[in-house]
């Protein structure tokens, strides 16, 4: 069920008009408000009979504060213009003002006693009183009495005005005439200046300090006056003679600086901006390489053709001139315009470039020919490229020398030395060491051939490695592989020179730590694969609810 929508009450003014028009019932507050029968209206209606508030505007909301009488304030007097000279006019009292006017007596003022002036202070100058025009226009009243008479009399002061037609020059009466300044004339201006001298900060005129000039109040510098030395120990500096019209160069250069040709610090004219570098490697330019050396200085010879018809001797020089014309570069023959040379620094060297415009292959009706743009260049300084083949010279390696291989016997017996290189160690063992005879002349085995040692050196008197090689006598049966393990050093002898001997021994129990191969030309070693730790795969097992293993994946 939907809630009833609340209907807003109509405006009281609309309710009152509807009720009066239709004759229906209206709310009592609406009727009292528009018929002014509220208690407040009744109080104002009956209270205004006995009390009169005038035009104060109580209850109107204006707040004007009363009614203005006339053009000015209540009881006010219009201002009198200062232009007319004579007695003041008697103004009538306005009828709208208050009926009772209270007269306030004025007390006479004593004459002003001048204050004593301080001799140490400047005297005060009083400016003359100047009557200036009013800021606002005043109301001018007509004079009701003639200026010749003085009707105004307050009983205390007598003012007598003598008409202008009477002559008072010889009556023995002194009349003082006061001249009033004109309204437009502001009068003379007075400027005062006061100076105080403090004797505490006075500087003596005579001083012994060289170059002191602040001691005197006035300094006069003249071209014809002689110089005066201030102080005893003064350094004399030669000065130039100054004359009118001469220009003195006051340029001061620091030590080590040189004078330049510039006269002013600011340039007198705007410098010309340098042109932007050309970009001749765009798609709109055809790249043409020119090999003729005349392209560098006299490129016009490669473009223009000489006409042999105008020569004097045609029969003798026609063929030669024609050959000379045909000698022109074919790439520059149809060029219509050629720019100035540009020098560029490339990775291959110094390059001279010129931008050219070929003759138009397409012409319009107006005579305009459209041609292609080309970039002509020539490399004059190839860098990194040999002009002529140079024979290669074999150079010795600096700071490197071959190693020394020494065969040292175990017991104190004479040793056998053989100089070999470290890089060709395997080849030396096969080719040179096998030629050593280890048997005596009687055919018996020599004891000196056993327990030999190989000592390898880098050439800097530093022993790299020493290993003992037990060599068997007879033929090519010599050790090939050394296997070091916990049980000692195992030597594997090859049974055949053709078959390949495995590096790993046949017994799986003998697992070597390091395998050394003397015939590979290197002394590096590798860890046996059996010693490397293998990565185990994590097995996933499936369990039942009772905890038993269901199966093991392979």
From Swiss-Prot:
Keyword field: Capsid protein, Cytoplasmic inwards viral transport, Disulfide bond, DNA-binding, Host endosome, Host Golgi apparatus, Host nucleus, Host-virus interaction, Late protein, Microtubular inwards viral transport, Phosphoprotein, Viral penetration into host nucleus, Virion, Virus entry into host cell
Function according to Swiss-Prot or TrEMBL: Minor protein of the capsid that localizes along the inner surface of the virion, within the central cavities beneath the L1 pentamers. Plays a role in capsid stabilization through interaction with the major capsid protein L1. Once the virion enters the host cell, L2 escorts the genomic DNA into the nucleus by promoting escape from the endosomal compartments and traffic through the host Golgi network.
Subunit and interaction comment: Interacts with major capsid protein L1. Interacts with E2; this interaction inhibits E2 transcriptional activity but not the DNA replication function E2. Interacts with host GADD45GIP1. Interacts with host HSPA8; this interaction is required for L2 nuclear translocation. Interacts with host importins KPNB2 and KPNB3. Forms a complex with importin alpha2-beta1 heterodimers via interaction with the importin alpha2 adapter. Interacts with host DYNLT1; this interaction is essential for virus intracellular transport during entry.
Organism per entry: Human papillomavirus type 41
Protein name (Swiss-Prot/TrEMBL): Minor capsid protein L2
Disulfide bonds: 19-26
Any one cellular-component term (Gene Ontology): viral capsid
An example Gene Ontology molecular-function term: DNA binding
Processing after translation: Highly phosphorylated.
Motif position, Nuclear localization signal: 2-10, 533-540
Main location: virion
GO biological process: microtubule-dependent intracellular transport of viral material towards nucleus; symbiont entry into host cell; viral penetration into host nucleus
Keyword Phosphoprotein: yes
Cellular localization per UniProt: Virion; Host nucleus; Host early endosome; Host Golgi apparatus
Cell cycle found in the keyword field: no
Family membership: Belongs to the papillomaviridae L2 protein family.
């Amino acid at each position: 069920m939907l809630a009833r929508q609340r209907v807003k009450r109509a405006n009281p003014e609309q309710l009152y008009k509807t009720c009066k028009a239709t004759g229906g019932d209206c709310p009592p507050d609406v009727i009292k408000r528009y018929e002014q029968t509220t208690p407040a209206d009744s109080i104002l209606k009956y209270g205004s009979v006995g009390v009169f508030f005038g035009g104060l505007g109580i209850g109107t909301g204006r707040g004007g504060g009363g009614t203005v009488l006339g053009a000015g304030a209540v009881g006010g007097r219009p201002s009198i213009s200062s232009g007319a000279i004579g007695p003041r006019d008697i103004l009538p009292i306005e009828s709208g003002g208050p009926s009772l006017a209270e007269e306030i007596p004025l007390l006479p003022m004593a004459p002003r006693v001048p204050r004593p002036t301080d001799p140490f202070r400047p005297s005060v100058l009083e400016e003359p009183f100047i009557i200036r025009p009013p800021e606002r226009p005043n109301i001018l009243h007509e004079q009701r009495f003639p200026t010749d008479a003085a009707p105004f009399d307050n009983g205390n002061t007598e003012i007598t005005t003598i008409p202008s037609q009477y002559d008072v020059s010889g009556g023995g009466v002194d009349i003082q005439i006061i001249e009033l300044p004109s309204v437009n004339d502001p009068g003379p201006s007075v400027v005062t200046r006061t100076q105080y001298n403090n004797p505490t900060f006075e500087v003596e005129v005579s001083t012994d300090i060289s170059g002191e000039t602040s001691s005197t109040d006035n300094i006069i510098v003249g071209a014809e006056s002689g110089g005066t030395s201030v102080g005893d120990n003064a350094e004399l500096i030669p000065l130039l003679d100054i004359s009118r019209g001469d220009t003195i160069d006051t340029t001061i250069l620091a030590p080590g600086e040189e004078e330049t040709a510039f006269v002013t610090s600011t340039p007198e004219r705007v410098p010309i901006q340098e042109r932007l570098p050309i970009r001749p490697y765009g798609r709109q330019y055809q790249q043409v390489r020119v090999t003729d050396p005349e392209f560098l200085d006299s490129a016009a010879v490669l473009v223009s053709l000489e006409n042999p018809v105008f020569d004097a001797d045609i029969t003798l020089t026609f063929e030669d001139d024609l050959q000379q014309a045909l000698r022109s570069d074919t790439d520059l023959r149809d060029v219509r315009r050629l720019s100035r040379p540009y020098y560029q620094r490339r990775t291959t060297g110094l390059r001279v470039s010129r931008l050219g415009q070929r003759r138009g292959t397409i012409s319009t009706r107006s005579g305009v020919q459209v041609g292609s743009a080309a970039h002509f260049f020539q490399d004059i300084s190839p860098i990194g490229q040999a002009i002529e083949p140079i024979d290669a010279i074999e150079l010795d390696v600096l700071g490197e020398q071959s190693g020394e291989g020494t065969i040292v016997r175990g017991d104190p017996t004479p040793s056998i030395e053989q100089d070999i290189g470290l890089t060709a160690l395997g080849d030396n063992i096969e080719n040179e060491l096998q030629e050593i005879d280890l048997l005596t002349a009687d055919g018996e085995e020599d004891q000196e051939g056993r327990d030999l040692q190989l000592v390898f050196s880098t050439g800097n008197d530093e022993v790299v490695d020493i290993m003992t090689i037990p060599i068997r006598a007879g033929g090519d049966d010599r050790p090939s592989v050394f296997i070091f393990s916990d049980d000692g050093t195992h030597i594997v002898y090859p049974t055949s020179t053709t078959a390949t001997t495995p590096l790993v021994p046949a017994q799986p129990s003998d697992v070597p730590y390091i395998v050394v191969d003397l015939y590979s030309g290197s002394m590096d070693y590798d860890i046996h694969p059996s010693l490397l730790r293998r990565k185990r795969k994590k097995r996933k097992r499936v369990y039942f609810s009772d905890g038993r293993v269901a199966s093991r994946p392979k």
